[in-house]
Regions:
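A structural signal for long alpha-helical coiled-coils and helix-turn connectors
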Residues: 23-27, 49, 56, 87, ...
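Long, hydrophobic N-terminal alpha-helical segment
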Residues: 1-40, 45
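A structural signal for well-ordered alpha-helices, especially hydrophobic packing surfaces
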Residues: 16-19, 23, 45-52, 73-83
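Short terminal interaction segments
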Residues: 64-126
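Juxtamembrane helix-loop transition sites at the ends of transmembrane segments
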Residues: 37, 48-51, 57, 95, ...
């Protein structure tokens, strides 16, 4: 692998590690940690996009990278699904309480997953 491909692979691996950390934070229902990891993921994604721009070819042509990309996308989708379920559970728990007690943090984090800006993994291959 040339230096640019190696760099891309390393950053992609970092993103994968963040996804695993995010999975654990979601499972622990540690919203502050999830929010912190989301910020780190955004920085890592920006680095990944920059690294991708420096490549002379499609990184998916490399079987090892292609496999990791698929894994990252799968992890991202799984985390989104699990987090959406968590938000829905919280919404259901809070439905009997006053409107003022609804958790804005959950909605904010859910919206982070729905945002369609350049920091989202779905836009990496567009």
């Amino acid at each position: 692998m040339n230096a640019e491909i190696t760099r891309f692979f390393e950053v992609l691996e970092s993103y994968e590690h963040l996804l695993h950390a995010e999975t654990q934070a979601i499972a622990a229902k540690d919203i502050d940690l999830v929010e912190e990891i989301l910020a780190k993921k955004d920085l890592c994604m920006a680095d990944l996009l920059t690294s991708k721009e420096n490549l002379g070819s499609d990184p998916r042509e490399d079987a090892k990278i292609n496999s990791l990309i698929d894994k990252v996308i799968e992890l991202q989708q799984r985390n989104y699904s699990i987090f959406s379920s968590l938000v829905e559970d919280q919404r259901n728990k809070k439905s009997g309480k006053s409107i003022n007690s609804s958790p804005n943090k959950y909605n904010k984090l859910r919206q982070t997953y729905l945002d369609m800006d350049k920091s989202r993994i779905s836009n990496l291959w567009d």
